[in-house]
Amino acid sequence: MAQIFNFSSGPAMLPVEVLKQAQQELRDWNGLGTSVMEVSHRGKEFIQVAEEAEKDFRDLLNVPSNYKVLFCHGGGRGQFAAVPLNILGDKTTADYVDAGYWAASAIKEAKKYCTPNVFDAKVTVDGLRAVKPMREWQLSDNAAYMHYCPNETIDGIAIDETPDFGKDVVVAADFSSTILSRPIDVSRYGVIYAGAQKNIGPAGLTIVIVREDLLGKANVACPSILDYSILNDNGSMFNTPPTFAWYLSGLVFKWLKANGGVAEMDKINQQKAELLYGVIDNSDFYRNDVAKANRSRMNVPFQLADSALDKLFLEESFAAGLHALKGHRVVGGMRASIYNAMPLEGVKALTDFMVEFERRHG
């Protein structure tokens, strides 16, 4: 079978080594004669999976001891509700920074539970889309927290600055598409959440990192399944968790540790992004309309100068083993999502195809 490179934005490509191990263990996991999908989540075998996954995740991100790690349901959209329901406390407003599609989606959901103070950080610089630097973000004095999204998958926009708003500002961040791709200082955040289906594992699992002093503030109307305190008190097993997704994510964490951890991923991700953006920037045939300072390393949208060639580009790239390159319907064009599991070899295959396609159709 020819090598296939999956550039989907999520559910995304998983490491080949992880898939092979899961395949080998599918019908006989740990010598039990059953699949990990069939064992009790409260049995000692799966408890070990859960404990190892949390330990490895903490190691990868150097999560401080005063932070809890929760393995949840509901995806990023579930957390759009969970964040205000858990950490508003007795306040009624929160600061939300709008830099793209997913930040705006979080704002829309938050309006059900509080009055968001929305700061529009989107700007245009020399005709390119960009984000105002954090020093220009206007925050209110009475907000329970400040929320932003460091990486916008649809817009291809990244905010790589580390927040530094003082110890009194609780920062909540949607890291769904950039978690584990580069080192982060967890201590600068009150809440970090990430849907698993991009850089962690398969869809169905969501990881939350929450500072322990923020527990115990949930609104009385908060569903138990979204209550951080209840999840923490029950070891993330208030109800039956997505065990297979948890197991696979644990395998991904071990794969990451065996391959140099987050620091090594950071280097490789930079190489991949430079290679792909380099081909785009050195061509009049392709274009990207995001300012270099805010370009995402995870999601690279690009357009062809002649959109009439879009269909042919997608057909030929698919035939060449380069899958899921169609851009989001909101933006159009193409989009290459190059998360941790995408090897440099895959990006090289894409850029070689792009150069050859331009040669034939430019």
UniProtKB/Swiss-Prot annotation:
GO molecular-function terms, A-Z: O-phospho-L-serine:2-oxoglutarate aminotransferase activity; pyridoxal phosphate binding
Compartment annotation: Cytoplasm
Pathway: Amino-acid biosynthesis; L-serine biosynthesis; L-serine from 3-phospho-D-glycerate: step 2/3; Cofactor biosynthesis; pyridoxine 5'-phosphate biosynthesis; pyridoxine 5'-phosphate from D-erythrose 4-phosphate: step 3/5
Enzyme class label: transferase
Protein name according to UniProt: Phosphoserine aminotransferase
Residues bearing PTM N6-(pyridoxal phosphate)lysine: 198
Family, as annotated: Belongs to the class-V pyridoxal-phosphate-dependent aminotransferase family. SerC subfamily.
Annotated pyridoxal 5'-phosphate binding sites: 76-77, 102, 153, 174, 197, 239-240
Key word Acetylation present: no
InterPro entries with a match to the protein in the record: Aminotrans_V_dom, Aminotrans_V_PyrdxlP_BS, Pser_aminoTfrase, PyrdxlP-dep_Trfase, PyrdxlP-dep_Trfase_major, PyrdxlP-dep_Trfase_small
Subunit structure: Homodimer.
NCBIfam families assigned: PRK05355.1, serC_1
Gene3D superfamilies linked: Aspartate Aminotransferase, domain 1, Type I PLP-dependent aspartate aminotransferase-like (Major domain)
Reaction catalysed by this enzyme: O-phospho-L-serine + 2-oxoglutarate = 3-phosphooxypyruvate + L-glutamate; 4-(phosphooxy)-L-threonine + 2-oxoglutarate = (R)-3-hydroxy-2-oxo-4-phosphooxybutanoate + L-glutamate
Major site of localization recorded for this protein: cytoplasm
Residue ranges of the TM segments: none
Residues the record lists as binding L-glutamate: 9, 42
Organism name: Escherichia coli O157:H7
EC numbers, comma separated: 2.6.1.52
A GO cellular-component term linked to this record: cytoplasm
CDD domains: PSAT_like
Note on how the cofactor is bound: Binds 1 pyridoxal phosphate per subunit.
Superkingdom of origin: Bacteria
Described purpose of this protein according to its UniProt entry: Catalyzes the reversible conversion of 3-phosphohydroxypyruvate to phosphoserine and of 3-hydroxy-2-oxo-4-phosphonooxybutanoate to phosphohydroxythreonine.
